[in-house]
């Protein structure tokens, strides 16, 4: 068996660009960059942790009661707060992995790592597996403040889907194992929950059918 080759350092490519609308209604350009890049992953760690600290401070200032603070925290998806993006970049740097970072306003507010190929559970053909995908804390639903940007998870998954079809020659569709609080997002995308394919941590398996993946890919 041939050992997977390492990603080429510096082989970054801007694959998509567009415009986001802030909560303030201001328009902000964004770009999605494909490629393995330790710097981008480290930026996610540093800037996102600063964002979490700022959010926790905001919660304490907005609500002095600790019980209500806990209720506010429970409204936020924090299950991935321990993720180490730099460590993931070190661990997942061979050719079967593809990295995507979304940049807006000089910061990376979304990141995604996919693995390929992966056999579909819903039909014939190979698709890709979403190893990790997340958005920055200031773009998550929270009871005490508006998200800066909305829809970044869908935007970066759409870009990954387009890349997979065009460059990797995979058929439309992707799958993943979802963190519990993220299941609602994937259900909203109309992904299918497939029983019996849970992972070692009992996380549910979801897959986007080919027809719906094509619609996602073709959406503006």
Which functions belong to the PLM regions below?
Residues 1-147, 155, 162-174, 181, ...:
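Non-catalytic substrate-recognition and accessory regions of acyl/acetyltransferase enzymes
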